Amino acid sequence: MKGILKKAMAAALVAVMVLSMSGCTEEEQPQTNQPQQEQQQDDGQQPETQQEQEEQSQQQTVTAPSLSQQLKEAKAKNDDIIGWLKIDDLKVDGAVVQAENNTKYERLNEWGQYSWTGTYFADYECNFDSRGSLSKNTVIYGHNVDFNDNRDGERFSQLLYFADEEFAKQHPYVYFTIDGDDKSSEMVWEIFSVFYTTTDFDYIRINKDYRNPQEGEITDAQLMNIIKGAQERSEYDYEVEVSGEDKILTLSTCSYKYGRRKDVRFVVMAKLLDEDAVLHTQAKLTQNTDKKTVE
């Protein structure tokens, strides 16, 4: 009988030990998880860092949209329409007009009808005959009609989204297409500067001399001065090479960041890319910590 009791007590003791081990907390079991963690590290399954994710995204490519059909249909309704402008994820997606002056379309839409918000209109001095004959500085204007710089407003109020670094990073290109019979008229422009400025900075210069347009368009040196001025004022330092030999696109609107001053503008500048350029999903940029600011 005693032998049977001893065996029963021994069995009970073993059962208690098993239950005790199975009730350990996670803090009491770090060593049992360690081999699994080490195996994960060996297999390279660790989460990617933000830098690695950005580098991977920058290696991905995108395809430019085709805007020729929209332009063709719009031009059939108004011969003043010379192009179609689009920026991904913004309301900026519409016809661009050009008149014999820069005032005709201030309060007209692209169909020539009255509109407080106007439309996108190109400077009357710009040339749009073909890709090869484009002006060195193609300037397009649009209204910002909200005195609070509401970036969700109409027309070029939307450009103010580029004041947000993450948005700027995710939107490296502007698409601007002109009338033409081949793919060369469908153009992609890579942004290299986003800035606030006063009109003292002559960033909209197209010809050498305003008084004598017959002298022709600005020189490479004059364009380079505009580019440098834009980069000095830019909210970001873009990793985009641009020179006076390039053709640039200038999108300009009013800004009320500094109150209701009439001389402040918000500008997005981009350079024309080659037809076979590879397009990436992100821009490489950093904050410009010593930018020239509006005074």
Question: Which residue stretches match the model-derived regions?
Answer:
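Bacterial signal peptide processing site
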Residues: 25-27
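Solvent-exposed, non-transmembrane regions of membrane-associated and secreted proteins
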Residues: 29-295
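A periodicity- and composition-biased signal for non-globular, repetitive helical segments
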Residues: 12-13, 47
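Bacterial N-terminal signal peptides that target proteins for export
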Residues: 1-12
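C-terminal motif of bacterial Sec signal peptides marking the signal peptidase cleavage site
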Residues: 19-23
